[in-house]
Amino acid sequence: MKKIAIYPGSFDPITNGHVDLIKRASKLFDEIIIGISQNSKKKAFLSINDRIDTINTALKDINNIRILSFDTLLVDFASLKNAQVILRGLRAISDFEYEYQLSGINKHLNPNIETLFMTPTEQYANISSSLIKEIIALGGDISVFVPASVKTLLKHRL
C-alpha cells in the first residue's frame, strides 16, 4: 500500500519552515499531499491560486507531492485522498497542547488516520506565516524567511 500523508495548512504564504518540513517528510512517504485549507473565517493574504503557484515553484525539485485545496473536515479530506497520516509541524512547546487536542479529535472522527508531529530544523523554529505578514505590513525584509517564489510574487504586488 502506498504511504500517503497530508500536510495541511493555510500556507498564506508558504515559509522556509514549511518547505523544510515537506522536504524532510517527502523522504518518509511515497506521497505528500499539501492541503491548502480554505478557511472562510480567515481573511486570506494570498489567493488560493497564488499559494498553489508559490508552493509549486518552491517545491519544484520534489517529485512526490501534490498540492490541493480543501474546504471540508481535514480527516474527511485525508480519507478521500487515501492518506493514512496527517503531518503537523510543532515549532514550540506552546503549539503542542492545541495540536494534541486536534489530533485526538481527528482520531475520534477517523480512527484509521494517524497524526505525525514533526519539529522544525532549528533555524526555522520561529517562522510563521502570521509573523511574515506582520513583517510585510511593517515594511521589513522577509527574504530569509520565505522561498524566492513568495518574495518575487510579493515584490510585484506591493
UniProtKB/Swiss-Prot annotation:
UniProt pathway: Cofactor biosynthesis; coenzyme A biosynthesis; CoA from (R)-pantothenate: step 4/5
Pfam families recorded: CTP_transf_like
EC assignment: 2.7.7.3
InterPro entries: Cyt_trans-like (IPR004821), PPAT (IPR001980), Rossmann-like_a/b/a_fold (IPR014729)
Membrane-spanning segments: none
Gene3D superfamilies per UniProt: HUPs
Principal EC category: transferase
UniProtKB keywords: ATP-binding, Coenzyme A biosynthesis, Cytoplasm, Magnesium, Nucleotide-binding, Nucleotidyltransferase, Transferase
Names of the cofactor(s): Mg(2+)
Amino acids binding substrate: S10, K42, L74, R88
Positions with a binding annotation for ATP: S10, F11, H18, G89, L90, R91, E99, Y124, A125, N126, I127, S128, S129, S130
GO biological process, one term: coenzyme A biosynthetic process
GO cellular component, one term: cytoplasm
Subcellular location: Cytoplasm
Catalytic activity, reaction form: (R)-4'-phosphopantetheine + ATP + H(+) = 3'-dephospho-CoA + diphosphate
Residues the UniProt record annotates as site (Transition state stabilizer): H18
Major subcellular location class: cytoplasm
GO function terms (MF aspect): ATP binding; pantetheine-phosphate adenylyltransferase activity
Family according to the record: Belongs to the bacterial CoaD family.
Subunit structure: Homohexamer.
Described purpose of this protein according to its UniProt entry: Reversibly transfers an adenylyl group from ATP to 4'-phosphopantetheine, yielding dephospho-CoA (dPCoA) and pyrophosphate.
Protein name, UniProt field: Phosphopantetheine adenylyltransferase
Designated gene of the protein: coaD
